[in-house]
Design a protein with these regions (language model features):
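Mid-domain alpha/beta scaffold segments of enzyme catalytic cores
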Residues: 1-131
């Protein structure tokens, strides 16, 4: 039995072939998948897939590269969305200074909110870190 603990089944190039990708994973012995969100606009799609597929679970979070696009993201939004029974983690979140895609202070602020949400819900946090 294998578990894919970090996949992005809703990414362009994958979502168009989602049924085939899921079938291949299952045929290869993957019995569960955690579909990770990286932007708020993905949350409903990630959760929707988890509702449709019994072996797919969801996370809610904002990737550090997207921090500038989510100014004001707070713990309350994360907690509210993570109340869905198919959501089993908070993230992907963290700090990524390598590509300099988002302001460092905004990344730190968002990361803190994710940590608060993880503590409040008791859900594990998915941390992305680079440089």
């Amino acid at each position: 039995m294998f578990v894919d603990s970090h996949c992005h089944l809703n990414y362009k190039g994958l979502v168009e072939n989602q049924a085939h990708i899921l079938a291949r994973a299952r045929d290869s012995g993957v019995s569960a998948m955690l579909n990770i969100s990286t932007r708020e606009r993905e949350w409903d799609d990630v959760i929707g897939l988890a509702e449709q597929e019994k072996d797919v679970w969801a996370s809610v979070g904002i990737h550090p590269h997207e921090a500038d696009q989510h100014v004001g993201m707070d713990c309350a939004k994360l907690v509210a969305k993570s109340a869905h029974p198919r959501v089993i983690a908070i993230g992907e979140t963290g700090l990524d200074y390598y590509y300099d895609k988002s302001d460092r202070a905004q990344q730190c602020s968002g990361f803190r909110e994710h940590i608060k949400a993880s503590r409040e819900t008791g859900l594990p946090i998915i941390i992305h870190t680079r440089d």
